[in-house]
């Protein structure tokens, strides 16, 4: 048996390094608010939190200036971003909110949920609940509808690559489909 002494407190840098070993799905949570497309990129989305009601969770930094606007929207779209969208994710995550959707033609539902075309999977949701969790807010989103680029859902103009984009070891990487 080996006995070790643990540090009194874990540093944020040590946590980031440890967490970087966990591949995380990358998604855009979006809505049109007052005629303006808004969205935030999250790598803290947890699918399958609950099947009844159907819920996902997303952790949002409490310093986000976009979340207060999104949380008030009647509906939110979720786009699971694909490996072919790795360059797009940097634009969507830009601190410059006005340029995030420059050159992008998002799909917006009548209730304002915003999704990115060509993403491997989409969710249409609404805010179910929020929980304060340290420097983040964990938002539970109730899933109202879904689709994915598989089988009958594939459209002629969709990209052939539906591999998921993940954030792993502080880089965006494609996660190949089986």
Ranges and model annotations:
Residues 2-178:
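Basic, polyanion-binding surface patches
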